[in-house]
Curated annotation (Swiss-Prot):
Keywords annotated in UniProt: Hydrogen ion transport, Ion transport, Membrane, Transmembrane, Transmembrane helix, Transport, Vacuole
Chief location: membrane
Membrane-crossing residue ranges in chain numbering: 419-437, 440-456, 472-501, 549-568, 587-607, 651-670, 724-748, 770-808
A Pfam family of this chain: V_ATPase_I
Single GO term (MF): ATP hydrolysis activity
Source organism per UniProt: Schizosaccharomyces pombe (strain 972 / ATCC 24843)
Tree of life domain: Eukaryota
Family: Belongs to the V-ATPase 116 kDa subunit family.
Quaternary structure and interacting proteins, as annotated: V-ATPase is a heteromultimeric enzyme composed of a peripheral catalytic V1 complex (components A to H) attached to an integral membrane V0 proton pore complex (components: a, c, c', c'', d, e, f and VOA1).
Protein topology in the membrane: Multi-pass membrane protein
Protein name: V-type proton ATPase subunit a
Disulphide connectivity of cysteines: none
C-alpha cells in the first residue's frame, strides 16, 4: 500500500527567495503545479495595507467591467464559447500584456455602455413617437365624428354641464350631473346653460391599470365638469413597452385655463404622457405625417445602433472567457504574493510554505526553467527549513478515493502522518451499510444507478448545471456503487430478493412423511451451502430466528470493527515512537474491551457451534450470563462450558485492573520523566561556568519554542476524560452497533409489507384483468421501492454507517488535530 494512502504524505517547510522581476511567472508556474501550501507571513497586516493592494483593486475593477459585459451578452442572447484558453494565455502574461488587455476591456466597456445608453435613449424616443402617432390617430378619428372641430362640443356644452361617452369608445363617470342635483364648479348664480364658455382639451396616454384612478380623481376634482373619451392603444405599444403593459389613450375636454392646467398636473402625476394635438384637421394631418417620418428615421438609427452593439458584443463574447481566466489568474497570483515579505535591500520576495517532500525535485526544476526563461539577474532560491511546527495533512486522492476521504475529512482532519481512516472506510463503510440495507434486488438497483454515473462520468462531469441532489450522487458515485455491490452480497447471504427467498440450492430441511404429533416439525438433513436456508422465510418462527441471528451478527461485527480500529492506534503509537502510549493506553484498552465484549463474541460463536438438541440441553442465555458476570461474579444460571465461572472471574478482575491502569500509569510516568529532566537541567546549570545573561535568555527562549511546558493537572484531566470516555464508550458503542440489526429488520419488514400490498394482490387475480392489474401494481411497487426503500431507506442506512465510523470506530484511534493541505492552485479559480 502506498504510504500516501495509509498515512499522509511527508511534507517539508520550504523558504523561497523570489526576485521581483520574475515573481509573477514563477508564481504562475507554481499555481499550475498545485503543490505548495503558502503561509501568511503578514498576519498582523490588514488586507488594504499589503503590498499588492493597488494591483488587486485594479484587476477587481476590470472584473467588474467584464461582469457588466457578460450581462449585456446574456441580455442579447449571444452564445459564449466554452472556456478554451489560447496557447499564449496558458501562463500568467507579462505586465505589459495585462495592461493592454485591461485597456482594451476598458475601451470596449465604454463603447458598449455608450451604445447601450444610445439604444435605450433611441428606444424611448421611438416608443414616444409611436405613442404620439397613436394618440394623433385616435384623436383625429374622434374629432372626425364631431365634425373635425371642438365647436359641436361647445354647442352641446351650452345645454349640459357634463359629457361622457355612451359606447365602447367612451368611459362615463356618472349620468347627467344635472339630474343628480350637482352643477360642478358653477355657483347657483352661474349655472345658466346659456353662459359663454371656451372649451379646450388635454390628450395623452396612460397605463390602463391607472386610467380608472385618473378618471375618478378628475371627476371628483372638477366636480363632473369635463368630458372624457378613452380608447385602447394599439398592440404595438403594448409589446414595445418595457413592462409589457396595456395602455389607454384618453382625451379630456374641459373649460378654463386653470382647469386644464390642473388636468395636466394630475395626469402627469399618475404617469401619463401628454401630447399636443391640433384642433383643426389639417394640423393633425401634418402632425401625423411628421410623426411617421420621425418614427422611420428613429427606427433606422435604432437598427444601426443595435447592429453595432451586437457586433461589439459578438466580438467580446469570443474573448471574454479567456480574459476572465487571465485576469482571475493574475489576481490570484497577487493575492498569494500578498502573503509574502518584501525585502527592500535585496529587492526580492520571501515566501514560506509547505511542499510534499516527493515534489521538491519537480518544484526545483520548475524554478530553474522559469529563471532561465525570464533571464533574471538574481537567482530563485529554495531552502528546506527544519522546524518543529506541525505540517498540514495531505493525502493524494483520485476520483475513486476522493469521496471516501471527504467523508472522513468532514469529521476532522487527521493529524500529520496519522493513520488514514479514509482508506479503511473504502471497505468498512459500504459493508456496514450493506448489513443494514442487505437485499439483492435493492442493491442491484442502487449499483445500476451508480454504474450509469460511472460510465457517463465524463459527460456528466462536464456539465455545470447539475441538480444539487444529482450532483451529490455523482460526486459519490463510487461510494454508491460499492454500497450497491456490498448490499447485493449481503442480500445473497440473507437470501433476500425484494423480501422474497431464492431457492438456488435445495433446502436442507425436509418434512417427515408420517408424523404422530399434531404439529409437524421439519428435520434438518444438512447445512445450506451459503447464506440462509430459504425454508426459514416461510417458517412460523422466521422472525424470531432472524432477529436472533442479526442481533448476534451485529455484536460480532461491532466488536471486530472496534478491535480493528484499536489496533490502528497501535500503528500510530509505533510510528510516532510513543512507547508509553502502547503499554499505558493501548494494552489496558485492548484487555478491557476483549475481557468483556471479546469474550461475549467468543461465547456467541461457541454457542452456535454446539448442537444443544443432541445434548438435550437448554442453551444458556448470554445476556443473563453477561449481567451476572459483573453483578455476581462466580454465579452461573446455566453452564456454557467447563471452568466458565473461574474464567469469568479472571476476566472481570482483568477489566477492573485496566481502569486504574488507564487512569494512573501515563500521568505518573510523565510526571517522573519531567521531574528527572528538571533535576538534570538544574544539575547541568550548576556545573556550567558563568555565561552571558543574554546567551542564557536565548537558550531558555529556544527551549520554550521547542517544547510546551509540562502541566501535570492538564495531563491528569485529559487522562481521566479519556478513561471515562473509553470505558463507558465500550458499553454504549457496542450497543450502538445493534442499529445494524434494527435497520436490517425494518428494511426487510417494510419491503415485505410493500410487496404484500401491491404485487401480491395482483398475482391473486387471473385472466386479462389480472394481467392488467399486475402491470399497474408493478408500477406502484417499483416507484415505491425506488423512492422509499432505495432512496429513503438507503439514505438512513448511509447516515447510520457514517455515525458508526465517526463515533464508534474513529474514537478508538483518531486524533484529528491536523489541518488540511491547501496548495496554491488555479484549478479552483478556473472552476
Amino acid at each position: 500500500m502506498s504510504p500516501s494512502l495509509f498515512r499522509s504524505e511527508e511534507v517539508s517547510l520550504v523558504q523561497l527567495y523570489l526576485p521581483t522581476e520574475s515573481a509573477r511567472p514563477i508564481m504562475s508556474a507554481l499555481g499550475e503545479l498545485s503543490t505548495i501550501h503558502f503561509k501568511d507571513l503578514n498576519p498582523d497586516v490588514v488586507a488594504f495595507q499589503r503590498s499588492f493592494v493597488r494591483e488587486i483593486r485594479r484587476l477587481t475593477d476590470t472584473e467588474r467591467l467584464l461582469r457588466y459585459l457578460h450581462s449585456e451578452i446574456d441580455l442579447n442572447g449571444i452564445h459564449v464559447p466554452d472556456h478554451n484558453l489560447p496557447p499564449s494565455y496558458e501562463s500568467v502574461l507579462e505586465s505589459s500584456t495585462i495592461e493592454d488587455i485591461i485597456e482594451r476591456i476598458t475601451r470596449l466597456e465604454a463603447r458598449v455602455r455608450q451604445l447601450v445608453e444610445s439604444s435605450q435613449l433611441l428606444e424611448a424616443r421611438y416608443l414616444q413617437q409611436l405613442e404620439f402617432a397613436n394618440v394623433l390617430t385616435k384623436a383625429d378619428a374622434f374629432f372626425s365624428k364631431s365634425g373635425n372641430t371642438v365647436d359641436p362640443l361647445r354647442n352641446n356644452y351650452e345645454t349640459s354641464s357634463i359629457f361622457s361617452g355612451e359606447d365602447d369608445t367612451t368611459a362615463p363617470l356618472i349620468e347627467n350631473a344635472l339630474e343628480l342635483g350637482t352643477t360642478g364648479t358653477f355657483d347657483s348664480e352661474e349655472t345658466s346653460p346659456q353662459m359663454n364658455t371656451t372649451l379646450d382639451f388635454v390628450s395623452g396616454i396612460i397605463p390602463t391599470v391607472k386610467f380608472q384612478f385618473l378618471e375618478r380623481i378628475l371627476w371628483r376634482t372638477l366636480r363632473g365638469n369635463l368630458f372624457i373619451h378613452q380608447v385602447r392603444a394599439d398592440d404595438s405599444l403594448i409589446h414595445g413597452a418595457e413592462k409589457n403593459e396595456e395602455k389607454t389613450i384618453f382625451l379630456v375636454i374641459a373649460h378654463g385655463t386653470q382647469i386644464l392646467l390642473r388636468i395636466r398636473k394630475i395626469s402627469e402625476s399618475l404617469g401619463a404622457t401628454l401630447f399636443p394635438v391640433e384642433e383643426d384637421a389639417p394640423g393633425r394631418t401634418s402632425q401625423i405625417q411628421q410623426a411617421n417620418v420621425s418614427i422611420s428615421d428613429l427606427n433606422a438609427v435604432l437598427e444601426n445602433t443595435r447592429s453595432a452593439l451586437y457586433t461589439e458584443l459578438t466580438f467580446i463574447a469570443e474573448h471574454i472567457s479567456a480574459w476572465e481566466a487571465v485576469l482571475h489568474k493574475d489576481k490570484t497570483v497577487f493575492q498569494v504574493m500578498n502573503l509574502f515579505n518584501y525585502d527592500q535591500n535585496h529587492k526580492c520576495l520571501i515566501a514560506e510554505g509547505w511542499c510534499p517532500t516527493a515534489n521538491l525535485p519537480m518544484v526545483q526544476k520548475t524554478l530553474r526553467n522559469i529563471s532561465d526563461l525570464t533571464d533574471s539577474q538574481a537567482p530563485t532560491i529554495l531552502n528546506v527549513v527544519h522546524t518543529s511546527e506541525q505540517p498540514p495533512t495531505y493525502f493524494r486522492v483520485n476520483k475513486f478515493t476522493e469521496g471516501f476521504q471527504s467523508i472522513i475529512d468532514s469529521y476532522g482532519i487527521a493529524t500529520y502522518r496519522e493513520v488514514n481512516h479514509g482508506i479503511v472506510a473504502i471497505v468498512t463503510f459500504p459493508f456496514l451499510f450493506a448489513i443494514m440495507f442487505g437485499d439483492l434486488g435493492h442493491g442491484a438497483i442502487m449499483a445500476s444507478v451508480a454504474l450509469m454515473f460511472v460510465l457517463y462520468e465524463k459527460t456528466l462531469g462536464a456539465k455545470k448545471d447539475l441538480d444539487e441532489i444529482v450532483g451529490m450522487v455523482f460526486y459519490g458515485r463510487y461510494i454508491v456503487l460499492l454500497m450497491g455491490l456490498f448490499s447485493m452480497y449481503v442480500g445473497f447471504v440473507y437470501n433476500d430478493l425484494f423480501s422474497k427467498p431464492m431457492s438456488i440450492f435445495s433446502s436442507r430441511w425436509v418434512w417427515p412423511v408420517k408424523s404422530e404429533e399434531a404439529i409437524a416439525r421439519a428435520v434438518q438433513v444438512g447445512t445450506y451451502p451459503i447464506g440462509i436456508d430459504p425454508t426459514w422465510h416461510s417458517a412460523d418462527n422466521n422472525l424470531l430466528f432472524m432477529n436472533s441471528y442479526k442481533m448476534k451478527l451485529s455484536i460480532i461485527l461491532g466488536v471486530i470493527h472496534m478491535t480493528f480500529c484499536l489496533f490502528l492506534s497501535l500503528s500510530n503509537y509505533r510510528f510516532f515512537k510513543r512507547k508509553l502510549d502502547i503499554y499505558a493506553v493501548f494494552v489496558p484498552s485492548l484487555i478491557f474491551l476483549e475481557a468483556i465484549f471479546g469474550y461475549l463474541v467468543i461465547t456467541i460463536v461457541y454457542k452456535w457451534c454446539i448442537d444443544w438438541k443432541a445434548k438435550d440441553l437448554q442453551p444458556p442465555s448470554l445476556l443473563n450470563m453477561l449481567i451476572l458476570m459483573f453483578l455476581s461474579p462466580g454465579t452461573l444460571e446455566d453452564q456454557l462450558y467447563p471452568g466458565q465461572k473461574y474464567l469469568q472471574v479472571g476476566l472481570v478482575i482483568a477489566a477492573l485492573i485496566c481502569v486504574p491502569w488507564l487512569l494512573i500509569v501515563k500521568p505518573f510516568v510523565l510526571w517522573r520523566r519531567h521531574s528527572n529532566e528538571e533535576n538534570k537541567y538544574q544539575s547541568l546549570n550548576s556545573d556550567l561556568p558563568n555565561v552571558d545573561e543574554a546567551d542564557a535568555l536565548m537558550a531558555v527562549d529556544s527551549q520554550e519554542k521547542q517544547a510546551e511546558p509540562f502541566e501535570l493537572g492538564e495531563v491528569v484531566i485529559h487522562q481521566v476524560i479519556h478513561t471515562i470516555e473509553f470505558c463507558l464508550g465500550c458499553v454504549s458503542h457496542t450497543a450502538s452497533y445493534l442499529r445494524l440489526w434494527a435497520l436490517s429488520l425494518a428494511h426487510n419488514q417494510l419491503s415485505s409489507v410493500l410487496w404484500n400490498m401491491t404485487l401480491a394482490n395482483g398475482f391473486r387475480m387471473t385472466g386479462i384483468v389480472g394481467s392488467i392489474f399486475v402491470v399497474i401494481l408493478f408500477g406502484f411497487w417499483f416507484i415505491a421501492t425506488c423512492v422509499v426503500l432505495v432512496a429513503m431507506e438507503g439514505t438512513s442506512a448511509m447516515l447510520h454507517s457514517l455515525r458508526l465510523h465517526w463515533v464508534e470506530g474513529m474514537s478508538k484511534h483518531f486524533e484529528g488535530e491536523g489541518y488540511a493541505f491547501t496548495p496554491f492552485t488555479f484549478k479552483v479559480t478556473a472552476e
